[in-house]
UniProtKB/Swiss-Prot annotation:
This is Pyruvate kinase PKM. It catalyses: pyruvate + ATP = phosphoenolpyruvate + ADP + H(+). The gene is PKM. The lineage of its organism: Eukaryota, Metazoa, Chordata, Craniata, Vertebrata. Its main location: cytoplasm. Keywords: Acetylation, Allosteric enzyme, ATP-binding, Cytoplasm, Glycolysis, Isopeptide bond, Kinase, Magnesium, Metal-binding, Methylation, Nucleotide-binding, Phosphoprotein, Potassium, Pyruvate, Transferase, Translation regulation, Ubl conjugation. Transmembrane segments: none annotated.
């Protein structure tokens, strides 16, 4: 599938793990991996950073963008609308500070993460800060009686979910505070449960509750979510990470709230419980993408099965050509330490090898002591892992999995990626209005970066969701002659690629363009040497 280096002339060749990428078998591929081989020049995986107290200043955000942040995530489980509006303003100020040089400008997307249908405990002894100690083996009564809403203690605990007695059985487990405290149901009443404390500990007020295996019937979109989503539409966010999605109708509900004004906002469904995993296919069809939210998922399903769910979801998203994000505890120890554990390094690399389009940081950048180091570490790990992909096998399988179609763009995308392997192209340049052409090319996972040139700022920002797309925003005025306008944008991409070190004079690039103006007409492929 690859030509020997001697035949390739003096062109810059993406030699990174090339020997391994083009092996015949998986075992051979593993044997050929070489620690002295350089990493991929351009990182293909998107990096999503949660913005919080540790990272919301304009100065820190500028450094995070330089370090590799592509998407800024705002967690609406915390903070007021005023707080988030200020954060969004800071993200945009930091992004636009690079706008003076169109070659080096990096569009950064803003993502709104909804609170979703959570279950929470009441107040401990009427105070938000009070705590009680739950002893292992003790009996704890769970009640729905509102008289105890602010009077919880070590003997009785109020929950805000009225149907809990209908959805749990005797023997069911109830987890509180991210699984730190576990209870087992011993007896059921009409409006109470008697439980035994299996894992004790210190319990504070208003803690999250998980009911693994239970079919929780809370509304997919709460009143708070509706207000938050409307706020997101006003603020022109690029994507919504919808929490606790359990079925396709939940996604439709989010879409309905976003309305006509928010119709271009991408909806990424977070899979966080057993029902979401079970009904994954219908959720995938209704969504623009998926997030593997390993935090709650690791409580809702056994911890040892999380990797299975991750691989299954990433595989199905890759097959469907939809973006997938791997999230939670990616570099958790970097909240307090400047270097990750070896397991975390492997975890991030394996998410990339599995096929994740984006990797996410949560507390590491929101409240950690080393937000910039965490971004840089993900950047370095992702580049190494991308070089180590078994590209030959992956491409063959993606082609086999794609159905026969009269969609011209599908054939163009497949052909251009195959050509990029054959001629060891340094990059693929795609001119795109809606982003669809670039998304289709990304689906076939080329080794080389896809430089997507667009004049639409939102298309550029949302393209970060897809593996391999390096979006660039062309601000030059549209030329009257179509051919001249095409040349202008291709030359702009060439200049960006050279400035970024993706290729140099004499290298080969694949150029995908349309034969006439407008969206949906990409049908011309050229193999071009870099001037």
């Amino acid at each position: 599938m690859s030509k020997p280096h001697s035949e390739a002339g003096t062109a810059f060749i993406q030699t990174q793990q090339l020997h391994a990428a083009m092996a015949d078998t998986f075992l051979e591929h593993m044997c050929r991996l070489d620690i002295d081989s350089p990493p991929i020049t351009a990182r293909n995986t998107g990096i999503i950073c949660t913005i919080g107290p540790a990272s919301r200043s304009v100065e820190t955000l500028k450094e995070m963008i330089k370090s590799g942040m592509n998407v800024a995530r705002l967690n609406f489980s915390h903070g007021t609308h005023e707080y988030h509006a200020e954060t969004i303003k800071n993200v945009r100020t930091a992004t636009e500070s690079f706008a003076s040089d169109p070659i080096l400008y990096r569009p950064v997307a803003v993502a709104l993460d909804t609170k979703g249908p959570e279950i929470r405990t009441g107040l401990i002894k009427g105070s938000g800060t009070a705590e009680v100690e739950l002893k292992k083996g003790a009996t704890l009564k769970i009640t729905l009686d509102n008289a105890y809403m602010e009077k919880c203690d070590e003997n009785i605990l109020w929950l805000d979910y009225k149907n809990i007695c209908k959805v749990v059985e005797v023997g069911s487990k109830i987890y509180v505070d991210d699984g730190l405290i576990s209870l087992q149901v011993k007896q059921k009443g009409a409006d109470f449960l008697l439980t035994e404390v299996e894992n004790g500990g210190s319990l504070g007020s208003k803690k999250g509750v998980n009911l693994p295996g239970a079919a929780v019937d809370l509304p997919a979109v709460s009143e708070k979510d509706i207000q938050d989503l409307k706020f997101g539409v006003e603020q022109d966010v690029d994507m919504v990470f919808a929490s606790f999605i359990r079925k396709a109708s939940d996604v439709h509900e989010v879409r309905k709230v976003l309305g006509e004004k928010g119709k271009n906002i991408k909806i990424i469904s977070k899979i966080e419980n057993h029902e979401g995993v079970r009904r994954f296919d219908e959720i995938l069809e209704a969504s623009d993408g998926i997030m593997v939210a390993r935090g709650d998922l690791g409580i809702e399903i056994p911890a040892e099965k999380v990797f299975l769910a991750q691989k299954m979801m990433i595989g199905r998203c890759n097959r469907a050509g939809k973006p997938v994000i791997c999230a939670t505890q990616m570099l958790e120890s970097m909240i307090k330490k400047p270097r990750p554990t070896r397991a975390e390094g492997s975890g991030v690399a394996n998410a990339v090898l599995d096929g994740a389009d984006c990797i996410m940081l949560s507390g590491e950048t929101a409240k950690g002591d080393y937000p910039l180091e965490a971004v840089r570490m993900q950047h370095l790990i992702a580049r190494e892992a991308e070089a180590a992909m078994f590209h030959r096998k992956l491409f063959e399988e993606l082609v086999r999995a794609s159905s026969h179609s009269t969609d011209l763009m599908e054939a163009m995308a497949m052909g251009s990626v195959e050509a990029s392997y054959k001629c060891l192209a340094a990059a693929l340049i795609v001119l795109t209005e809606s982003g669809r052409s670039a998304h289709q090319v990304a689906r076939y996972r080329p080794r080389a970066p896809i430089i997507a040139v667009t004049r639409n700022p939102q298309t550029a920002r949302q393209a970060h969701l897809y593996r391999g797309i390096f979006p660039v925003l062309c601000k030059d005025p549209v030329q009257e002659a179509w051919a001249e306008d095409v040349d202008l944008r291709v030359n702009f991409a060439m200049n960006v690629g050279k400035a970024r070190g993706f290729f140099k004079k004499g290298d080969v690039v694949i150029v995908l363009t349309g034969w006439r103006p407008g969206s949906g007409f990409t049908n011309t492929m050229r193999v071009v040497p870099v001037p």
